[in-house]
């Protein structure tokens, strides 16, 4: 296993991540939740959400709090289960635009952990 991330093409992302990103962008909560393990965690803005109910509430809130566009602009991979997808967001949130890392840890073909940070 390599400990240093290396660049990868977005077309090479695992299907579970592309499915999640598609659902997230479309604001399809049911499809997005299906991508997570039963004990998954999401950390966003320093707060951690545990399990499907908290993650669904977070997704619902984040989808309605601001209007924004989101576009994947790059990806790196440490190993098959540790991936980082860089996104550019523009919208009516404070600052108006930001690049955010979506750092995924996969387990058994699903998302076990997602950390979103600058």
Annotate the PLM regions.
Residues 25, 40, 44, 93-95:
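Flexible interhelical turns and helix-capping residues at alpha-helix boundaries
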